[in-house]
Swiss-Prot record:
Keywords per UniProt: ATP-binding, Auxin biosynthesis, Ligase, Nucleotide-binding, Plasmid
Reaction catalysis annotation: (indol-3-yl)acetate + L-lysine + ATP = N(6)-[(indole-3-yl)acetyl]-L-lysine + ADP + phosphate + H(+)
PANTHER family per the UniProt record, alphabetical: CAPSULAR POLYSACCHARIDE BIOSYNTHESIS PROTEIN (PTHR36932:SF1)
Family of the protein in this entry: Belongs to the ATP-dependent AMP-binding enzyme family.
GO-annotated biological processes: auxin biosynthetic process
Enzyme Commission number(s) from the entry: 6.3.2.20
Primary role: Conversion of IAA to IAA-lysine.
GO molecular function terms listed in the Swiss-Prot or TrEMBL record: ATP binding; indoleacetate-lysine synthetase activity
Signal sequence segment: none
Pfam families from the UniProt entry: AMP-binding
Keyword Nucleotide-binding included in the entry's annotation: yes
This protein's name: Indoleacetate--lysine synthetase
Length: 395
């Protein structure tokens, strides 16, 4: 792996960017000119640009609402056909890599928990690959006869976020039906080790698992089918990517987006590096993964780092914030029961309590920490079906 050179990449794509964004100045810009003259697009800037596009756009669109990681409702528009620039279309990305092929029979799990926008765009994308698509709907209403019906059509692909894929597996097994799934395509969040284990236990070690990195505003940005599923190949013909401080910014290089993105801040951070002529993203995470505890800002990363230093390995954790009956703030850190014994749980609890900004709350006798073992499948998820990292119930 070598470092990503934004100056060099800008030189490669500046003419394309000038055409897509109808700004001839871009052709003569150096990358530093681009940074200086083009402001970063935030959520408000995206909304304003969307309104301008609505005023002049004659094509009909799908309107999708998504809560985002923040929980705030935001509106996005998508072209119905998903095929604007054929050479870089979403469907070609999936077809050319063999993720979804003609004749595949795909279960669209984005209809679980009201994923309306992803439901339609994923259905259209899979359809354009030549695949057949069935929308599963609310998994709590799916019975044994429904799973038998899915078996009868030779269902072989699952499309969804990790938690909805696990919901499907749990319901399938509860109803005593086995479906021979050959491929699992996940997006929306990273695939945890325990989730991957459950998928392989359900469908066999040979099942193909593909991860898709994307955003509501930009669509599909990258993909991974590496064994670790943490190294995403970025679609550098679709977007120009920058790293400004810790922030990831993207600029559209095709006409696929209803709202063209120009230095749009995703709210993610990642490590950018090159392998040959391909750009890869690793260590993708949200920029702000922290919480306020007794006046101190505690990053989720420092807790994860403390656990790794204590045990010599990483764990998937979930943090709950609450208030005790004595009106003291309580930080409860859930760790995987299958990965941690009682002795290790105590060691983790002691180590977290010794984090300086947390220890201060102990010294004031105003806060406390508890570490509990829990089945990772019982970790709380959001209304969108994503695993929550920090849950604040102090109100």
């Amino acid at each position: 792996m070598t470092a990503y050179d934004m100056e060099k990449e800008w030189s490669r794509i500046s003419i394309t960017a000038a055409k897509i964004h109808q700004n001839n100045d871009f052709e003569g810009f150096t990358y530093q000119d681009f940074r200086t003259h083009v402001p970063i697009m935030d959520k408000d800037g995206f909304a304003a640009q969307t309104e301008r596009c609505l005023e002049r756009n004659e094509r009909n669109c799908l309107i999708g609402f998504t809560s985002g990681t923040s929980g705030n409702i935001k509106r996005c528009y998508y072209y119905y056909d998903c095929e604007v620039d054929e050479d870089s279309s979403l469907s070609n990305v999936f077809r050319s890599n063999g993720f979804i092929l003609p004749g595949d029979r795909c279960a669209n799990l984005f209809t679980i928990n009201l994923f309306s926008a992803l439901n339609n765009t994923i259905t259209m994308m899979a359809g354009n690959c030549g695949a057949h698509v069935v929308s599963v709907g609310d998994i709590t209403l799916v019975t044994k006869s429904h799973f038998e019906a899915l078996n009868s059509i030779k269902l072989n692909v699952l499309l969804g976020v990790p938690s909805t894929i696990l919901q499907f597996i749990n319901a399938m097994q509860h109803n005593g039906v086995h479906i021979n799934i050959e491929k699992v395509v996940f997006t929306g969040e990273s695939l945890k080790t325990f989730q991957k284990k459950i998928i392989r236990q359900a469908f066999g070690e040979q099942v193909s698992i593909v991860g898709v990195y994307g955003s509501s505003e930009g669509g599909i940005l990258g993909f991974t089918n590496s064994p670790c599923h943490t190294e995403y190949e970025f679609l550098s013909d679709k977007y120009f990517i920058e790293k400004e401080g810790d922030s990831i910014l993207i600029t559209s290089l095709t006409r696929e987006n209803f709202t063209p993105l120009l230095r749009y801040r995703l709210g993610d951070t990642a490590t950018l590096s090159m392998k040959g002529d391909k750009l890869y993203l690793t260590d993708i995470q949200r920029e702000d993964m922290s919480f306020n505890f007794m006046g101190n800002l505690i990053g989720l990363g420092i807790i994860q780092q403390t656990i790794k230093q204590t045990l010599g390995r990483s764990l998937e954790i979930q943090v709950h914030l609450s208030v005790t009956e004595e009106r003291k703030e309580l930080v409860t850190v859930f760790v995987q029961a299958s990965e941690v014994d009682e002795d290790e749980r105590v060691r983790i609890e002691t180590a977290i309590a010794d984090i300086p900004d947390i220890k201060e709350a102990y010294q004031k006798n105003q806060g406390t920490v508890s570490v509990l073992r829990k089945d990772a499948r019982d970790y709380a998820v959001s209304e969108r079906g994503k695993m929550l990292y920090i849950i604040d119930r102090r109100n």
